[in-house]
């Protein structure tokens, strides 16, 4: 059984409202879904006989500030039985909440915390959704494209006081232009 069979079978079996877009490549299959059907789709991928996804490799976030739903959350899955990789993607904005998949894949707990900490995408029913990489009092989400390059506060060790101090940064941020074109491709200006 190969990626092509899994792709074709999934297309014929899955409810059409669960999948917005499907794409097949030599590296695996990609399914774009609405946040409302994310949990059901991942449950299908894990439990169905012809997909049998046992491993959630990781969850990543991507920020596209020009989109209405600016955040894309990507679930990379692996079916060991069928030697197949499956990528499930969903989009969210600042207020959209995504269903936690910790009950399906216990390892998702760490990655959902990371996506929350770095991007601010909230997972509903997560057992312990708190910051994982930044400090307790940290404000903002540092992998968002609108996060200031220098941050909001400077944290340093003050030798005379013998403690770590946080001070607000008082320099203004320069304008940032997001050019998504590859710097290695030649652009024609005209």
UniProtKB/Swiss-Prot annotation:
InterPro entries membership: NADH_DH_suC, NADH_quin_OxRdtase_su_C/D-like, NADH_UbQ_OxRdtase_30kDa_su, NADH_UbQ_OxRdtase_CS
Subcellular location: Mitochondrion inner membrane
GO CC terms: mitochondrial inner membrane; respiratory chain complex I
UniProt keyword rRNA-binding present: no
Enzyme Commission number, as recorded: 7.1.1.2
Topology versus the membrane: Peripheral membrane protein
Segments passing through the bilayer: none
Enzyme class, UniProt record, top EC level: translocase
HAMAP family assigned to the protein according to its UniProt record, in alphabetical order: NDH1_NuoC (MF_01357)
Record's subunit section: Complex I is composed of about 45 different subunits. This is a component of the iron-sulfur (IP) fragment of the enzyme.
Record's function text: Core subunit of the mitochondrial membrane respiratory chain NADH dehydrogenase (Complex I) that is believed to belong to the minimal assembly required for catalysis. Complex I functions in the transfer of electrons from NADH to the respiratory chain. The immediate electron acceptor for the enzyme is believed to be ubiquinone.
NCBIfam families reported in the protein's UniProt record: NuoC_fam, PRK06074.1-5
Name of the protein: NADH dehydrogenase [ubiquinone] iron-sulfur protein 3
